[in-house]
Amino acid sequence: MADIAAPAADTSSETAASADNPGDLLAQIQQRGEIVFGTEGTWSPWTYHDENDQLVGFDIEVAQKVAEKLGVKATFLEGEWDGLLAGVDGGRYDSMANGVEITEERAQKYDFSDPYCYIRTAIIVKSDDDSISSFEDLNGKTTANTISSTYATLAESYGAKTTGVDDLNQTIELLLNGRVDATLNAEVTYFGYLVIATRPPARCSPAPNSST
């Protein structure tokens, strides 16, 4: 992963309610006594399963506290990242608990909580690859990320071609097998991967002024 010249990215929870009707959704949640969160469950340390197969993570804990404050039960439905936003749109989820980055485009469509985490975006490459150490080095390279993620958008803005994946595990497999050159993700997510890695780790490639 690399520190790169990217704007600060706010991590927050995102709700299905638009700015026009947030009270309607809140009333529905309180009436049924339950708030339903969409989450991946495969993105450590934010939302993942522990050794007892329990859904845990920082986003999960924040969502549980939100439910507690509302006086309702928190229910989590797991799905792939690229389907979570559609699930919010379609009413399958009331909100997302999955490190949703606030962007201008998303803010026009969704309500966000205040940011509760700031993360740094980093470039992950194979340990023996010295050709990529900055965002500019991604030009002409192939990266792996979930298609609708801000990481994919960022990589493409620097001239990379993005291969779509379902989750971080698939991303790392493609990278270590040489099918892609790099991937972008939160720096802390990469460090979490190292804790449980069963294959030789990829390299976190630092670059100046990287933040997200």
Question: Which residues make up each language-model segment?
Answer:
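Bacterial lipoprotein signal-peptidase II cleavage site
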Residues: 1-11
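Extracytoplasmic small-molecule ligand-binding "clamshell" domains
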Residues: 10, 19-99
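A structural signal for short loop-to-beta-strand junctions that line the ligand-binding cleft
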Residues: 26, 58-59, 107-117, 202-206, ...
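Beta->alpha turn/N-cap motifs
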Residues: 38-43, 77-82, 91, 95-103, ...
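Ligand-binding cleft/hinge of the Venus flytrap
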Residues: 47-52, 63-72, 148-167, 194-199
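Short helix-initiation/N-cap motifs at beta->coil->alpha
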Residues: 60, 76-86, 130, 148-149, ...
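Periplasmic-binding protein-like
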Residues: 117-125, 187, 191-212
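Flexible hinge/capping segments at coil-to-helix
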Residues: 126-142
